[in-house]
């Protein structure tokens, strides 16, 4: 709850372009007013297209340049080991992002140093801004690559299922002697009929009409009512 507490767990959004999701979570947790979300990417707003640790409480690392976030997370995890602190470090990457060579240098180091306080989550939705990941520059099989660098790998069949995610985090916490990589198979645009698995929605906003349809789709599936009461049931698993 205190973003400056030395022994807090850290989270690095390596795929920094998905910052709106992080901002929403931070606002719901009380780090800044929910109303400020309406200023996203406005001139002068502190909520820009990529998270900035100097201006946004709760952000542990500025990110956006793909591939760099995991390196920062590895450094944080190593620091905890060197100072005998017990905090944990989580970092979220995209499957397109792991085409960056720096990701694998960081993974090699993390496995070599047996950083069991590090959890790497790969959002494996199979799409990136230029098209299907396996057609742009295939990083598959992802899990086997992390295993080669001495990671414990958890293959998450439904990365959109919060209960499965919570179970994976529990397993990661109980894993000793090696870092954990969670390969989360997700659906891009999950729950919105015209967005699901459509690469064109990687980086654009819906207009008013599309927004109305999207919200109705989410209400039908119950996605819009996924409450923080449900999410808080998993608060202690990290």
What are these regions (language model features)?
Residues 102-125, 181:
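A short alpha/beta connector and helix-capping loop motif
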Residues 118-130, 143-148:
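Active-site pocket-lining segment
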Residues 1-112:
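Cofactor-binding active-site loop characterized by glycine-rich and histidine/acidic residues
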Residues 94-97, 124, 186:
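Active-site metal-binding loops of divalent metal-dependent hydrolases
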Residues 135-143:
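Short, glycine/polar-rich helix-capping loops at beta-to-alpha or helix-loop-helix junctions
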Residues 230-238:
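Single conserved hydrophobic/aromatic residue that forms the stacking wall/gate
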Residues 151, 159-227:
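Glycine/aspartate-rich loop-and-adjacent alpha/beta segment that forms the canonical ThDP
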Residues 91-93, 152-157:
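Short catalytic-loop micro-motif centered on adjacent basic/acidic residues
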């Amino acid at each position: 709850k205190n973003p400056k507490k030395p022994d807090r767990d850290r989270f690095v959004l390596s795929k920094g372009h998905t910052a709106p999701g992080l901002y929403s979570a931070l606002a719901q947790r009380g780090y800044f007013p929910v109303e400020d979300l309406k200023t996203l990417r406005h001139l002068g707003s502190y909520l820009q297209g990529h998270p900035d640790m100097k201006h946004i409480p709760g952000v542990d690392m500025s990110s956006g340049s793909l591939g760099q976030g995991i390196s920062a997370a590895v450094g944080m995890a190593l620091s905890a080991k060197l100072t005998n602190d017990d905090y944990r470090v989580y970092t979220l990457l995209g499957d397109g992002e792991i085409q960056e060579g720096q990701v694998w240098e960081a993974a090699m180091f993390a496995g070599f140093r047996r950083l069991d306080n590090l959890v790497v989550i790969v959002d494996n939705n199979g799409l990136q801004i230029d098209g299907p990941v396996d057609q742009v520059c295939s990083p598959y099989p992802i899990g086997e690559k992390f295993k080669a660098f001495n990671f414990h790998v958890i293959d998450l069949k439904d990365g959109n299922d919060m209960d499965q995610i919570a179970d994976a985090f529990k397993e990661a916490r109980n894993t000793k002697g090696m870092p954990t990589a969670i390969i989360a198979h997700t659906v891009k645009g999950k729950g919105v009929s015209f967005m699901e698995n459509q690469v064109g929605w990687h980086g654009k906003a819906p207009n008013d009409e599309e927004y109305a349809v999207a919200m109705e789709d989410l209400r039908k599936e119950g996605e819009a009512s996924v409450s923080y009461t449900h999410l808080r049931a998993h608060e202690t698993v990290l």
